[in-house]
Amino acid sequence: MKVLFVGIGSIGTRHLRNLHTVAAERGIQLDVTALRSSPRALPEDVAALINNQIMQLDDTVYDLAFITNPTTLHYNALKDLKGKSKFFFIEKPIFEDSIYLQGDWICVTSAVIICYF
């Protein structure tokens, strides 16, 4: 499964570890990419769970994208990932302002977010 993490701070790291645990239990092989805003080195135990670290998106399409960067960056991350992921996990709160629920896409929120672009 091709997975992208946007933001790999403490929250992203927690989700990364949990995903690896669940995938291992189910025999799912992961190919994890971390989209980073900083070139600083990750802790070795975290880096070992990541196959690729990138500073900008390319044309790769992912099965799943985790958006775990700061809330103020969620909307732009979603816009940048339009057409690049089949499913999204977005750390709450999804947006800092409901204005983001307007425009060229519609989001329905509950326990799951479904975005129609």
Question: Which role does the model predict for each range below?
Answer:
Residues 72-91:
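Rossmann-fold NAD(P) dinucleotide-binding segment
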